[in-house]
C-alpha cells in the first residue's frame, strides 16, 4: 500500500480538490477572445441605444445608470468626448446582468421589425404615387380599394402634380399626393381594425 500523503489524507480517492467531477462549462473562465467578442457586442448595443430617436429610447427598459450615461453621450458633440463617454457606456453595460441585457436586445429587435414595416409602407405609398401620376386607370383601382378618399381632391392633386412636373416647378403637389395616399391607407387600416368591426346583432 503506498504511503499516505497530505493530499491522499484529504482526498481518499487520491485526487486533488475539485477533481471529483468535470467542471461545468458555465463555470469555466472565458477565453480572452470570447471576452473581447462580448465586449464588442455590448459596445454595439450601446451605440444602437445612443442613436435611437428620443421616443424609442424612452421605451427601452434599462437601469437608471445606463440611461443617464446614454443621455449624456447624446449631448456631447466633440468626437473625442463622445468616444470617451461611449467607453463609459460600455463599462456600465458590462455591469448589467444577462436578463437586463436580454431585455434591451429584445426592445432593439422589436424596433427593427417596426422599421421594416414602416419601410414597406413607404414603398407602397411611393408605388401608388408613381402609378397615379402615370395612368388614369390607376385612380379607379385606388378608389376601389380606398372608398373613403375625397375623389375630387385627389384628382386635383394628381392633375397639379403632373403640371408642376411638366413645368419643372417645385414638387408641392407631388408631396401632397404622397400625404393623400398615406392618409387613405391609414383610413383603410383604421376601418379594418377589430375595434371598428360591427357588433353582432342580438
Curated annotation (Swiss-Prot):
It holds the Pfam family DarP. It comes from the Bacteria. Residues 1-13 have a biased composition (Low complexity). Residues 1-39 are annotated as: Disordered. Signal peptide: none annotated. One of its GO terms (cellular component) is cytosol. Member of a network of 50S ribosomal subunit biogenesis factors which assembles along the 30S-50S interface, preventing incorrect 23S rRNA structures from forming. Promotes peptidyl transferase center (PTC) maturation. This is Dual-action ribosomal maturation protein DarP.
Amino acid at each position: 500500500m503506498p504511503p499516505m500523503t497530505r493530499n491522499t489524507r484529504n482526498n481518499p480517492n487520491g485526487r486533488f480538490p475539485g477533481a471529483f467531477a468535470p467542471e461545468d462549462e458555465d463555470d469555466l473562465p472565458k477565453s480572452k477572445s470570447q471576452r473581447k467578442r462580448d465586449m464588442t457586442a455590448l459596445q454595439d448595443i450601446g451605440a444602437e441605444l445612443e442613436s435611437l430617436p428620443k421616443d424609442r429610447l424612452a421605451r427601452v427598459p434599462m437601469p437608471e445608470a445606463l440611461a443617464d450615461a446614454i443621455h449624456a453621450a447624446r449631448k456631447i458633440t466633440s468626437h473625442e468626448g463622445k468616444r470617451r463617454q461611449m467607453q463609459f457606456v460600455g463599462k456600465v453595460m458590462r455591469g448589467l446582468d444577462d436578463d437586463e441585457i436580454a431585455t434591451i436586445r429584445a426592445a432593439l429587435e422589436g424596433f427593427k421589425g417596426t422599421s421594416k414595416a414602416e419601410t414597406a409602407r413607404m414603398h407602397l405609398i411611393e408605388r401608388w404615387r408613381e402609378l397615379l401620376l402615370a395612368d388614369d386607370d390607376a385612380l379607379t383601382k385606388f378608389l376601389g380599394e380606398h372608398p373613403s378618399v375625397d375623389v375630387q381632391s385627389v384628382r386635383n392633386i394628381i392633375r397639379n402634380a403632373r403640371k408642376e412636373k411638366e413645368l419643372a416647378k417645385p414638387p408641392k403637389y407631388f408631396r401632397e399626393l404622397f400625404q393623400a395616399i398615406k392618409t387613405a391607407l391609414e383610413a383603410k387600416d383604421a376601418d379594418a381594425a377589430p375595434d371598428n368591426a360591427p357588433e353582432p346583432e342580438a
